[in-house]
Amino acid sequence: MKIPHIPVLLNEINQAFEKLNSGYFLDCTLGFGGHSESLLKDHPNLKLIACDQDKEALEFSKKRLHDFKDRTEFVLSNFSQILDQISHDKLNDLKGILADIGVSSYQLDNNKRGFNLHSDFLDMRMNQDAKISAFEIINNYTQEQLSDIFKKYGELNDGYFIAQKICQERQKNKIKSAKELYEIIGKTKQNHRSVSKATLVFQAIRIEVNQELKVLKNLLEKLEKIKLKNCILAIICFHSLEDRIVKNYFKKWAKNCICDERAFRCECGNNHSLGEIISKKAITPSKEEIMINSRSSCAKMRLFHFKNMEK
């Protein structure tokens, strides 16, 4: 079986969850099953709940993980909704959670998915049943809407002019492919950054298509409300917007005191911590991993340990 995607930070994931003995492990973003396969091999008593919104990836992983079918439950779902579909008993026995918030190599390399700068299509939907694709956004959003998402999700300082250029071109003919869009944007780089403006525009469009920041926040909000007991959460991000969200939530969860910073003394009880941050700094790929898989270079993993704390 040819594997179309190399899992990032695999050794670091195995190390983070090395003490798992039994219970359930939730892979919120199963993809092509690399992380889950490794964990199932190393932990024979572990049961897996495997979730992905990409039908192609889920079907592939069902075949890949066939040897573990008695310990694996597959769910077609966006990761922000998966917690609503797990029974109370399983949530109580949840010992590990992984969310790898990135586009797979298969999605990037598959021409029809339209994620690649040189693709003949303009799609970018991780869930192929979703109604809005990159085509609708590029051809139907107003100049102001496009400018806003380029600034907000691409952190582009000239998003207005890029949006203006796109709107001028689409008046002549609809923009039908990623490579057309790439040619319109051009190959110039954003000031003080190594990536091209086109890459940042594509990032912004992809985030808008899949509502990536919104679904990440939804997942984190739901995790905050669940009384997880002795459970390790690992989240892998690939750009600063997502990583910033995860970092801030982890800091919030680790706080015992939630009083206003201007308060002279603690009045909240000083017992609100959900657990602890396992590593203060984000875990990044080794030089050796980046040499083997250059796409891993942007990956950052943060770990949080939910303790047994009854509120």
Tell what function each PLM region has.
Residues 1-311:
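S-adenosyl-L-methionine-dependent methyltransferase catalytic core, i.e., the SAM/SAH-binding region
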